[in-house]
UniProtKB/Swiss-Prot annotation:
PANTHER family, sorted: PROTEIN PREY, MITOCHONDRIAL, ZGC:162634
Protein's name according to its UniProt entry: UPF0434 protein RD1_0037
Entry similarity comment: Belongs to the UPF0434 family.
Organism of derivation: Roseobacter denitrificans (strain ATCC 33942 / OCh 114)
Coiled coil: none
GO cellular component, one term: cytosol
Highest taxon listed in the record's lineage: Bacteria
Length: 61
């Protein structure tokens, strides 16, 4: 991790839910994504900010 890379604040998980399923999310540090197992979606984290848009989410395999 570089010095200029912004890190996701895990405390945000307490306030965030999946916009599709309205369920809690899991943080995938390696892929920098928030995972909704219920909706089968992964929301990207860009510059430490979660992008909670369904259109931006990746469908999980």
């Amino acid at each position: 991790m570089s010095e200029t890379e912004v890190v996701f604040d895990r405390r945000m998980l307490e306030a965030l839910i999946c916009p599709r399923s309205h369920e809690t999310l899991k943080y995938d540090q390696e892929r920098q994504e928030l995972i909704s197992e219920t909706a089968n979606l992964a929301y990207p984290i860009r510059n430490g900010i979660p992008v909670m848009l369904i259109d931006e989410a990746r469908v999980l395999d």
